[in-house]
């Protein structure tokens, strides 16, 4: 990518719509716009106040392509930090396509995926963590996920990383004094000071790292698999949670023969709910495939919700499923609670904790609120819901923090063992670099390409 190129792209989704938006960014943006745009007043774009919507037409050799509104944002006070033109035309494939083709004919290049945001990063308007937050804002599935992403876009994570790197700089200053002036009698004081400050730094990194598990769920969703043998009420439960008849509900065992997936917002948690085929021995080829898919879904699940028929005693099939869930985060639902209870709860307690057993009636909508509260407490543990200002949601950030934490641990061990300060210096510089991966201070071009490749073309 050449930063001195002028680029353009369609910023809105393809298809029919009320408005289509095209974006131009770069040194020639204004010149190109002046060539193809004629305002209704006859004034040039520069004669208008910046950031003003100008009414006019896009023309090609005096032929009007479309009636538009145009905005000019002069760099560096724009999204990319460059001169930016945004054209609002009528939505629809033809108008937008013809305007883009006209723009590209003026020595303008089609933007690569995420190139507008990449330029914002390269021009210093935002750092890398803020750039990545743009995608999270777009893809947020709940209010809390959106709030977390918006806070990161506004710089909450950037600020924290700067604070941590400032602490590293301070500790490094002590180390470098000790290395440069070994004859000075400051060794004992320096070791003690460094141990205290490095331990504090290590705790700060760990505290931030610990938000990553819940953050990943907010960003990607909690994969929740509903399991149980046939006809215990799994599909009724799914319909109760979704509030619609998404799954087939009958008295015939094996009705759900495939894996049904839905996203639902549970108290701010994006749940990717997977309703599986009932697990049982069967000669039906199609149902057998569904059963195998159900078993496979166990391995990748973040949470298992097992449904049991409370009106019947535990069967061998029930126990076989419970055995598979021993090491999984599991909630057991005793369904059909409106009927006489026959199930033996004490046997279930061999496999799950008491507070993970909830009595419900999926058909009567009883116990659903308690299930939602339980999921909320398992995911958030109160931390994110009460403070969504600083949460690590990106796996790349989590990996960098993990490496920074290990280096902080190594530095602390070196100090506790009174090893030469040169060893400590190496560990501290590693911490500095790993934290820099997050905000983009220490990052390679290949990594940047990989990150922005996940963006859409017009962003």
UniProtKB/Swiss-Prot annotation:
CDD domains, A to Z: trmE (cd04164), TrmE_N (cd14858)
Entry binding sites for Mg(2+): 235, 256
InterPro entries registered for this protein in UniProt: G_TrmE, GTP-bd, GTP-bd_TrmE_N, GTPase_MnmE, MnmE_dom2, MnmE_helical, P-loop_NTPase, Small_GTP-bd
Job of this protein: Exhibits a very high intrinsic GTPase hydrolysis rate. Involved in the addition of a carboxymethylaminomethyl (cmnm) group at the wobble position (U34) of certain tRNAs, forming tRNA-cmnm(5)s(2)U34.
Pfam families, sorted: MMR_HSR1 (PF01926), MnmE_helical (PF12631), TrmE_N (PF10396)
Residues binding K(+), per UniProt: 231, 250, 252, 255
Organism: Clostridioides difficile (strain 630)
Highest taxon of source: Bacteria
Binding sites annotated in the UniProt record for (6S)-5-formyl-5,6,7,8-tetrahydrofolate: 23, 86, 125, 459
Family listed: Belongs to the TRAFAC class TrmE-Era-EngA-EngB-Septin-like GTPase superfamily. TrmE GTPase family.
GO cellular component, one term: cytosol
Manner of cofactor binding, per the entry note: Binds 1 potassium ion per subunit.
Subcellular localization, as worded in the UniProt entry: Cytoplasm
Keyword list, A-Z: Cytoplasm, GTP-binding, Hydrolase, Magnesium, Metal-binding, Nucleotide-binding, Potassium, tRNA processing
Protein name, UniProt field: tRNA modification GTPase MnmE
Subunit-level organization: Homodimer. Heterotetramer of two MnmE and two MnmG subunits.
Chief place of localization: cytoplasm
An example Gene Ontology biological process: tRNA methylation
């Amino acid at each position: 990518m050449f930063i001195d190129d002028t680029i353009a792209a369609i910023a809105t989704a393809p298809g029919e719509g009320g408005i289509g938006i095209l974006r131009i960014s770069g040194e020639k943006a204004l010149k190109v716009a002046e060539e193809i745009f004629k305002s209704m007043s006859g004034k040039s774009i520069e004669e208008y106040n910046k950031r003003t919507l100008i009414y006019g037409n896009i023309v090609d050799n005096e032929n009007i392509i479309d009636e538009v509104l145009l905005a000019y944002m002069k760099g560096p006070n724009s999204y990319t930090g460059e001169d930016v033109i945004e054209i609002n035309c009528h939505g629809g494939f033809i108008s937008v396509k013809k305007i883009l083709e006209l723009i590209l004919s003026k020595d303008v290049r089609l933007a690569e995926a995420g190139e507008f945001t990449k330029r914002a990063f390269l021009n210093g308007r935002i750092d890398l963590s803020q750039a990545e937050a743009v995608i999270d804002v777009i893809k947020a599935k709940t209010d809390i996920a959106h709030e977390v992403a918006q806070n990161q876009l506004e710089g909450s994570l950037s600020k924290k990383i700067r604070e941590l790197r400032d602490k590293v700089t301070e500790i490094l200053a002590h180390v470098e004094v000790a290395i440069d002036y070994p004859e000075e009698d400051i060794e004992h004081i320096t070791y003690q000071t460094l141990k205290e400050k490095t331990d504090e730094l290590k705790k700060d990194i760990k505290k931030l790292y610990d938000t990553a598990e819940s953050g990943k769920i907010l960003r990607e969703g909690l994969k929740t698999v509903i399991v149980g043998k046939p006809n215990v009420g799994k599909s009724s439960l799914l319909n109760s949670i979704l509030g619609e008849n998404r799954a087939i509900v009958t008295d015939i065992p094996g009705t759900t023969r495939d894996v049904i997936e839905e996203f639902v917002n549970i108290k701010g948690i994006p749940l990717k709910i997977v309703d599986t085929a009932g697990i049982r021995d069967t000669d039906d080829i199609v149902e057998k495939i569904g059963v195998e898919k159900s078993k496979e879904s166990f391995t990748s699940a973040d949470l298992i919700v097992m449904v049991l028929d409370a009106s019947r005693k535990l069967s061998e099939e029930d126990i076989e499923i419970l055995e598979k869930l021993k090491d999984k985060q599991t909630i057991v639902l005793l369904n059909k609670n409106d009927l006489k209870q026959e199930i033996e709860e004490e046997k279930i307690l061999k496999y799950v904790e008491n507070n993970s057993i909830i009595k419900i009636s999926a058909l009567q909508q009883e116990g659903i609120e308690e299930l939602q509260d339980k999921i909320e407490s398992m995911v958030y543990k109160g931390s994110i819901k009460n403070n969504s200002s600083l949460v690590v949601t990106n796996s790349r950030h989590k990996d960098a923090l993990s490496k920074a934490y290990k280096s902080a641990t190594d530095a602390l061990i070196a100090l506790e063992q009174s090893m030469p300060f040169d060893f400590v210096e190496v560990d501290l510089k590693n911490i500095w670099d790993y934290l820099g991966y997050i905000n983009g201070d220490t990052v390679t071009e290949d990594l940047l390409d990989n990150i922005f490749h996940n963006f859409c073309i017009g962003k």
